Amino acid sequence: MFNNPDFSDIATCDLEEPKNSIKIEREQVKLEKRLCREVGRAITDFNMIEEGDKIMVCMSGGKDSYTMLDVLRKLQKRAPVKFELVAVNLDQKQPGFPDHVLPEYFKSIGVDYHIETQDTYSVVKRVVPEGKTTCGLCSRLRRAILYKVADELGCTKVALGHHRDDIVQTLMLNMFYGGRMKGMPPKLVSDDGKHVVIRPLCYVPEKDTVRWAQYQNFPIIPCNLCGSQDGLQRVAVGELLREWDKKFPGRVESMFRAMGHIVTTHMMDPELHDFKNAKATGIADPNGDMAFDHEEMPVSASLPGLQVVQLSS
């Protein structure tokens, strides 16, 4: 019986040292090590993969799903447990979808795969009024179909290609437009209780999947074939975060880390903390006096010319 196998020590995957000392080759090797390390760490931290698992790797044809499949295959060769991978693509019959691209790629790398063809595009276009967003219904239909395919293939886990930036964007979207603090969990059980969904790229920043896709020259399929205008809010938030990270490097990473360090007593959710019955007990509380303290934050190195004067008390 394997309990939370450790993938974090196989960061080198099956790397070969670059034959030449060209800068781009060194960068590629460093990036591959980093991707394997971060995915391995996520798998270990959240016990994503266990002995005998059959992982359904959901493939959209975008940079993130290609990167996820590539890294999982590399980790599979040296993992402390045995598991299977099957790449699955849902062909929703969107106009112009190049249905030959993914099968040809899967055959070229020798991975088991399944193409599920379901014309959800026509259903969505028929049901959703003109000018309204189609992504919500499309997503629900796609999820139901993929769960059915997972059952048919005997898969124990469903792997999605959401990366760190997707998770932070989702948190911000829910805060800005939904009035709640909710992101994307690294691992969850589906609503019907039958499927475990994992996000192996949860520690990986988007810039790394972009760069890796460029290095590997993956045959990318565009994500706008359906013509939907949904996601404008997500695009806007994504641009905001990217611009913010340029001005204040490390802020997006800090926001991501914050999602794993929730101080429930300092939020406002009565379901998480009993504020109504909070009373003085006479027992010292290390967080108690902080209610009156101004919390000191590190000064950003990206603010040139700012001199911080330390005042003596």
Swiss-Prot record:
Segments traversing the membrane: none
Secretion signal span: none
Entry's Gene Ontology cellular component terms: cytoplasm
Q: Where is this motif: PP-loop motif?
A: 60-65
> What InterPro entries does UniProt report for this protein, alphabetically?
Rossmann-like_a/b/a_fold, TilS/TtcA_N, tRNA_Cyd_32_2_STrfase, tRNA_thiolation_TtcA_Ctu1
The protein's annotated catalytic reaction(s) are: cytidine(32) in tRNA + S-sulfanyl-L-cysteinyl-[cysteine desulfurase] + AH2 + ATP = 2-thiocytidine(32) in tRNA + L-cysteinyl-[cysteine desulfurase] + A + AMP + diphosphate + H(+)
**Which EC number applies?**
2.8.1.-
* A Pfam family annotated for this UniProt entry: ATP_bind_3
Cofactor remark: Binds 1 [4Fe-4S] cluster per subunit. The cluster is chelated by three Cys residues, the fourth Fe has a free coordination site that may bind a sulfur atom transferred from the persulfide of IscS.
Subunit annotation: Homodimer.
Q: Quote the protein name from its UniProt record.
A: tRNA-cytidine(32) 2-sulfurtransferase
Q: Which gene encodes it?
A: ttcA
